[in-house]
Amino acid sequence: RGLGDVYKRQEVQQIEEKLKTALKPSRYRHTLGVAYTASCMAMVFGVDVHKAYRAGLLHDCAKGFSMEEQRALCKQYNISLEGTLTKSPQLMHQEIAPFLASDEYKEQDSEVLSAIACHTTGKIGMTPLEQIVFIADYMEPNRKMIPGLSKVRKLAFEDLDKCTKTILKNTIEYLTECGQEIDERTVETYKYYRDKKEN
């Protein structure tokens, strides 16, 4: 192991300690679950394991704040509260997280920040790292069993595109059944992966 690995390990430990204080225990357990799952998937798909772990750790770093505090952070970071964020305030944490990860947790890697920025809604043409964090968030071991989760967990280590498409389809169906607002990015992303030709 080189000196770089030691520094990386120390950086990660500092992030973990800070998150443990900032998040509720259940949210912190989920965070670790996403980080571990993302790093395992990264090994399978040849993606940088350190980046996957850090993105998994930081994806929900804004969840420790109340909705009111999240609104204030949106204003601070000039994030528009128009449109879906008005109807689906639970998406605010996704918008805030990249800024918070950079400012409070000193994460400067653009690929990590980009993966954090679309971990809930997805986006058209995601990179493998972005897909890995998106998938890991949905199916990490601490998640309660929901219809279709076993299929997702199998696909997660076989085909990122098929797995992404399945999650988006499940999410849209669930939100429709519950009568909840569906972010247009989620719909657009689903259509993209539904229509994407297999390589």
Where are the model-predicted features located?
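Divalent metal-dependent catalytic cores for phosphoryl transfer on phosphate-bearing substrates
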Residues: 17-22, 44-166
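A short, charge-rich alpha-helical start-of-domain segment used by transcription regulators
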Residues: 25-27
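Short, small-residue-biased leader/transition segments that mark boundaries at the very start
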Residues: 1-7
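Charged phosphate-binding loop/patch that engages nucleotide di/tri-phosphates or the phosphate backbone
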Residues: 173-199
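N-terminal glycine-rich anion-binding loops that anchor highly charged ligand groups
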Residues: 30
